[in-house]
Amino acid sequence: MSTTTNEAVTDVAAQRKAAVQALLADARTIIDEKGVTREALAAISARLLELATHRALFDSADFPPPQRDSGDTSTRYRLNPGEDGFALYLNSLLPGKTTIPHNHDTWAAIAAIDGAELNRIYRRTDDGRDPERAKIELAQEVVVRPGVPIAFLSDDIHSIHVGGAEPTLHFHLYGRPLETLTGRLGFETDTGLIVRYNATHMQRATQAVG
């Protein structure tokens, strides 16, 4: 790799880090001023949409999905590794990626750089008294794509479904790092069982980029 190429790569990495830190600073200010509310998450989502326009800083070549024959359907990149509190990830998903309905145990905001992801949003219809079982029903569907974000409070429930032929590249910003979310719940629609989502369904590996 030539000196000029090395300098260009270093420059992009520095610009990316600065853009990430600016986003996180803005998100902290929004939460400090508005609290954890849907209004605050809408403002954070708008800020994430702006970050997603800086495509040269988040090129899919630098954040590739898994190989199609690997057996995996997602790669998660942590953009502010080692930091406590807010955690920004870039998720690269292959077509065919799905999840069971789950909550997050913290707030979340999601915005797309590339690709479309169907989000099915659910509501609980039981009284919540049984810690092992729940009844949920589909309330809404939202296709997250460039220009169309989505956000969730900690108890909101959704599932994701990636169709089509092309991978996705989406920002996911959380109030706390995913690996710390021990109260995150998954909901098995066929049995009604509630499961610990991180323990049973979350891909543990995260690549640090920062």
Language model features: what each stretch is:
Residues 124-157, 195-196:
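Short acidic-glycine-tyrosine-enriched beta hairpin
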Residues 105-123:
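Glycine- and acidic-residue-biased ligand/ion/polar-headgroup-sensing regions
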Residues 65-95:
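A short glycine-rich, His/Asp/Glu-containing loop-to-beta-strand
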Residues 89-103, 153-155:
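Conserved short histidine dyad/triad with adjacent acidic residue
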Residues 109-111, 165-181:
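A short hydrophobic beta-strand segment most commonly corresponding to one strand
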Residues 1-56:
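N-terminal leader/capping segments at the start of a protein or of a new domain
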